[in-house]
Design a protein with these regions (language model features):
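Tryptophan-rich substrate-binding surfaces of secreted polymer-degrading and adhesive proteins
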Residues: 1
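Bacterial N-terminal signal peptides
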Residues: 4-15
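Pepsin/retropepsin-fold aspartyl endopeptidases
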Residues: 19-288
Length: 288
C-alpha cells in the first residue's frame, strides 16, 4: 500500500475489518473523534481521513491499554519525503458500541495524537457510510461526487493545474500540503512561488517537519487551496525515541499528491466529506 503521504508495508497480512452495516456522522470540531473500547477499556480515537484502514497507537498508549504486540510481526511506515519508522503489529479487540472490528493496529515510538488515545482511519469504522461534518451547510450547496479506488482509503484522483494528482483530506489542520513530486512539477510550471521562510508544520501521527510556504492560484474542483505549504527534504521531528526515524536513502516514488487542508474546505463552504462504501464514492458537500 503506497499513499502520497505515507505508506505501510506489513511483514504479516491479516483479514480486513468486519463488514459495515450502517452510518455514522462525526463532528470535526476541531478533529473528528469516535468513542470505542479497546480490550474492554473505553477510549477516544481521532479519525484521520489520511489514514488507511488501521489503528495507530503510541508505545505508551499501547502499554496503558494493555495492547499486546504480536510476536515476530512488524510494520514499517514510510512517510513521504521524511524517511520511515518501524513499529509492531497488534490485533486488539475494538468495539464501536455494539459493533466489533478486528482492526490491524500499529504501535509506534511517536506521539500519534495529543487529542485522543490513538488515531484510526475512517475505513476501519464498521459502517456503510462515514461522514465527517466540517461546518454549517451553505444555503445553496452542491455535491462533488468522486470515485474511489478503495472505499476504505479516502483519496481520489483529480485535475490540479492541468496535472493528475492524488488528493487527500486533512480536516484537523488548516494548511494544504503539496508533496515533493507535486512540488517539483508545479515549481517547473512556475505556479507555486515561495511566500516566506521555512516553517515547522504537522505531518501525521504527531510528527512534524519544516515546510516552505507558497502562494498559488491552483484549485481542485473549484476549491482554492488556501494556505499552502510545500514539502522539503527536511527530516521528520517529534519521535519519542532517538533512532525511531530511518533516513530516506532513495528518491520517493510516491505520486504527486495534494493534501487539502481544513481552511480550504471551510472557505469553500464545505459542510461535510463522506464515503459510501457500497457505491465506492466520496462526496464533498460544498457551497455552489
Amino acid at each position: 500500500m503506497h499513499w502520497g503521504l505515507f505508506s505501510f508495508l506489513f511483514v504479516l497480512w491479516f483479514a480486513g475489518p468486519v463488514a459495515a452495516q450502517t452510518s455514522i456522522t462525526l463532528e470535526a470540531s476541531p478533529v473528528a473523534i469516535v468513542d470505542a473500547t479497546i480490550n474492554g477499556r473505553p477510549v477516544r480515537l481521532e479519525v484521520d481521513p489520511r489514514m488507511p484502514d488501521m489503528l495507530a497507537l503510541s508505545t505508551p498508549a499501547a502499554e496503558r491499554l494493555g495492547v499486546r504486540r504480536l510476536p515476530f510481526a512488524q510494520v514499517q511506515v514510510g512517510i513521504e519525503g521524511g524517511g520511515s519508522m518501524r513499529g509492531r503489529i497488534a490485533r486488539p479487540n475494538i468495539r464501536f458500541g455494539e459493533r466489533s472490528a478486528r482492526n490491524m493496529a500499529g504501535i509506534f515510538p511517536v506521539p500519534v495524537s495529543t487529542r485522543a488515545d490513538g488515531v484510526i482511519g475512517p475505513g476501519s469504522l464498521p459502517y456503510d457510510i462515514v461522514t465527517i461534518a466540517i461546518g454549517a451547510e451553505a444555503a445553496a450547496a452542491r455535491d462533488i461526487v468522486l470515485p474511489l479506488e478503495n472505499p476504505d482509503a479516502w483519496f481520489v484522483q483529480a485535475d490540479v493545474g492541468g496535472r493528475s494528482l492524488r488528493v487527500l483530506f486533512d480536516v484537523a489542520n488548516d494548511a494544504s500540503i503539496l508533496n515533493r513530486p507535486a512540488v517539483r512539477a508545479f515549481d517547473r510550471d512556475g505556479v507555486i512561488p515561495s511566500a516566506g521562510e521555512l516553517s515547522e508544520r504537522p505531518v501525521i501521527l504527531g510528527l512534524s517537519t519544516l515546510m516552505q510556504p507558497v502562494t498559488t492560484s491552483l484549485t481542485v474542483h473549484g476549491i482554492e487551496l488556501g494556505p499552502t505549504f510545500a514539502r522539503t527534504v527536511s527530516p521528520l521531528l517529534g519521535a519519542l525515541e532517538e533512532d525511531a526515524i530511518i533516513a530516506e536513502g532513495a528518491a520517493s516514488e510516491t505520486p504527486p499528491t495534494l493534501t487539502l487542508g481544513g481552511q480550504a474546505l471551510l472557505s469553500a463552504g464545505c459542510s461535510s466529506v463522506s464515503v459510501n462504501r457500497r457505491t465506492r464514492q466520496l462526496t464533498l458537500r460544498c457551497a455552489s
